[in-house]
């Protein structure tokens, strides 16, 4: 799990979940995120005068490579309209491992079309189902 908030680090109690203090995007960079842990509505938009902390942004592909992951089975993302950027940074992973996907499609008006296109460009074998503003994708087993 990649997520920038301190609360997550305190609350995760599962042995098979490792919180990583990074965000996901289409390039390796930095972003400024709010330090206010009381704000847990799913996003951290900074307005004029607010301060925050620098958070490292990586790609799914770079993370998989750096961690030498032998498999990736599932990617779930509700990242406030940044799903398309995450998918652009996951092309190699989608092509190589074909993980099942569960993504939100309600943040931007063209999310349903854009996200499906990005997935199928990375791996044309994916079958996509969209319902209730969610996108589910998997490569059928042979």
Task: Provide a role label for each language-model segment.
Residues 4-142:
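Phosphate/nucleotide-binding beta-alpha loop and adjacent structural elements of enzyme active sites
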